[in-house]
């Protein structure tokens, strides 16, 4: 009898499942892909990136939903092909909304596990991100969102192992029914890799590890792995073209420090997204 009840609940959940297919493609520009602090060492580049995903949302209760998904993402860089990446992944998350109203507060707890295959195979590895996000609408047009994430990347070459903590907060404004803009602050703390033409005894004395690399061509650079703290400001806009398609623009300015090292990144993105 108990087994029959469980099966009925599962069948009912699948009946209320919401399948979703989504994809986006576009370009991204990074003003300091090498994460360098000296202008002579800085290397910028742009990439074409794409992401496709399929997901299933199961309404477990009136307010609780289980999200299951799979995705495939990739980046193709113009000048520095060692950073070309393709990576499949799978995710599972629980989303809870405290009421049925549009302005009801909500939270999402999600975990994604994937594998990132770099053209420079030494950098390839397994990526796991545990993410908590929450939001609340202040009015019909304004909402606040924020959260925390922990990322762990494990590679066969442990020089490329990374752990990262990230906290974010943003305000979202619906300008019109088709246009949405947002502004946010992001704090990141964890392992970063900075590239520099040697000798750099000022960095070497506090770096966790270092390796000689040719990913940026000549002259050869040394990759320094260190603990970095990043403060970033982000701005984005999304315009709904049709029921299923939108255009998205984004900009992030970030400053990463580990005294005496400090470097800046300007990242600009433009994407077309579709969802069904």
Feature locations, PLM:
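Surface-exposed strand-loop-strand hairpins of Gram-negative outer-membrane beta-barrel proteins
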Residues: 29-51, 80
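Residues that define the transmembrane beta-barrel architecture of outer-membrane proteins
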Residues: 44-50, 82-90, 124-130, 152, ...
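Residue-level signature of outer-membrane beta-barrel architecture
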Residues: 54-58, 94-98, 134-136, 140, ...
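Repeated loop/turn-to-beta-strand initiation elements of outer-membrane beta-barrel proteins
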Residues: 62-66, 99-107, 138-146, 177-183, ...
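Outer-membrane beta-barrel "beta-signal"
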Residues: 239, 264-276
């Amino acid at each position: 009898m108990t087994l029959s009840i469980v099966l009925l609940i599962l069948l009912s959940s699948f009946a209320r499942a919401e399948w979703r297919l989504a994809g986006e493609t576009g370009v991204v520009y990074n003003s300091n892909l090498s994460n360098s602090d000296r202008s002579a060492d800085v290397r910028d580049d742009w990439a074409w990136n794409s992401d496709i995903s399929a997901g299933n949302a199961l309404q477990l209760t009136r307010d609780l939903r289980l999200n299951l998904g799979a995705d495939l993402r990739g980046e193709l860089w113009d000048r520095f092909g060692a950073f070309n990446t393709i990576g499949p992944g799978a995710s599972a998350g629980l989303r809870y909304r405290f009421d049925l109203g549009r302005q009801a507060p909500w939270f999402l707890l999600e975990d994604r596990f994937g594998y990132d295959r770099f053209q420079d195979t030494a950098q390839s590895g397994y990526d796991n991100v545990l993410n908590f996000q929450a939001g609340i609408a202040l009015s019909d047009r304004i909402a606040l969102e924020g959260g925390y994430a922990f990322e762990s990347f494990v590679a066969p070459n442990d020089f490329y192992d990374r752990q990262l903590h990230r906290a974010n907060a943003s305000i979202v404004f619906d300008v019109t029914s088709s246009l949405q803009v947002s502004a946010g602050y992001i704090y990141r703390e964890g392992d970063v890799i900075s590239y520099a033409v040697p000798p750099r005894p000022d960095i070497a004395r506090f770096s966790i590890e270092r390796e000689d690399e040719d990913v940026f061509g000549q002259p050869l650079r040394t990759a320094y792995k260190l603990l970095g703290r990043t403060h970033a400001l982000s701005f984005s806009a999304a315009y709904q073209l049709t029921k299923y398609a939108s255009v998205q623009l984004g900009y992030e300015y970030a400053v990463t420090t580990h005294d005496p090292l400090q470097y800046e990144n300007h990242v600009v993105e433009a994407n077309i997204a579709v969802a069904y």
